Every structure is written in structure tokens, then in C-alpha cells.
């Protein structure tokens, strides 16, 4: 299992945020990646996915708690621009990843960040830690 290193950057994908915030069965595996906010990178597509899921399943108050935490990472938030969109489209064609997953993976690749997830779509891809 990969553990965070002070010199590396990490993207915890939507599945990891939901597990961690909801104290799911894999929350403990994701917890170390949230301990150093300076090492976290947060793609805006992750904000969308997590906020929506929490809003639907846990309500507005819980979703807004996540949003407040996401705002604390504003300096590490990566916005989808045209270059990243094209890179993600290429990744999707090459790997078969769905759109949101391709954006997340392309963001990690672009930044040289490790992607930490429990989503089986990412299994076998370079730079991915599957919990």
C-alpha cells in the first residue's frame, strides 16, 4: 500500500472523499492522504461529484461541510481548461475511462501527482493507488 510522502502530491478521487467524509469501510485507508493539505490537489470535477453525492445522500448541511473543506484547498484546486479537456479526451479514448474519471486521471498525469482511489475503473493504470 502507498502511504503519503512529504515530497509528493496526491489527488484523492471522489470515491476517496466520500469514503473518508462518510466514515466508510475504506476511510482509514484514505485518512493519511488528508493529513497534509499541502500535498492534496483537488480537481473541480471532484468537487462536483462529491458535493452532488453528499447532497443527494446526506443532505445540504453535510454537502456544505465538504464545500467548506474544499474551499480551504482553493490554492490547490485545478480547473478544467481546454488543454486539460483535450488531454482527458485522449486519456478516455486510450483507456476507456468515463469522462469524469478521465479528467481526474489526466489531471494527475499532467501534475505528476499520484491518484488515490477505490474506483476499479483505474485498476492497472500508472500512478494509481487502488485502495
PLM segments and residue spans:
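Acidic catalytic patch
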Residues: 71-93
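Histidine- and aromatic-rich ligand-binding microenvironments
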Residues: 12-13, 42-44, 96-98, 119
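A generic structural signal for short hydrophobic patches within well-formed alpha-helices
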Residues: 17-18, 47, 122-123
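Conserved glycosyltransferase catalytic-site signature
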Residues: 14, 82, 101-102
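Acidic, PIN/NYN-like endoribonuclease modules and their adjacent C-terminal/linker elements
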Residues: 1-7, 105-131
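Short, well-structured N-terminal submotif of metal-dependent ribonuclease cores
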Residues: 1-42, 55-68
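Amphipathic alpha-helical segments within well-ordered protein domains
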Residues: 51-52, 89
